[in-house]
Amino acid sequence: MKRVHVIVEGRVQGVGFRYFVQHEALKRQLTGWVKNNDDGTVEMEAQGHESAVQLFLDTIEAGTMFAKVSRMHIEQRDVRPDEKQFRIMYGGGL
C-alpha cells in the first residue's frame, strides 16, 4: 500500500477537476480525498496499491479537455488503514 499527498497547479478549479479526480480514484479502488484551495490549487491524498496510485497520478497529470495541469507536488504519507472511501471535500476542511 502507498499513500501520497498531492498539490496540483494549473487550470484546475471551475472545470470539474475534483470530480475527475474522484472518478479516476474510484476506478482504481483508491481511498482519500480531494479539495480546492483558496490559492487556486487542488489538494488531495490518495491511497491504494502502488501500481494503482502511480497510474492514478499519471492520469491526473494528463488532465482533461478542460483542466490543464502545469505542476504536481507529490509527497509520500503514512497509510491510513481504516480509510474506506475517496471523497470530495467542500469548504476547505478535513
UniProtKB/Swiss-Prot annotation:
The keyword Protein biosynthesis does not apply. It catalyses: an acyl phosphate + H2O = a carboxylate + phosphate + H(+). Coiled coil: none annotated. Its EC number is 3.6.1.7. Transmembrane segments: none annotated. Keywords: Hydrolase. Pfam families: Acylphosphatase (PF00708). InterPro entries: Acylphosphatase (IPR020456), Acylphosphatase-like_dom (IPR001792), Acylphosphatase-like_dom_sf (IPR036046), Acylphosphatase_CS (IPR017968). SUPFAM superfamilies: Acylphosphatase/BLUF domain-like (SSF54975). Signal peptide: none annotated. Belongs to the acylphosphatase family. This is Acylphosphatase. It comes from Geobacillus thermodenitrificans (strain NG80-2).
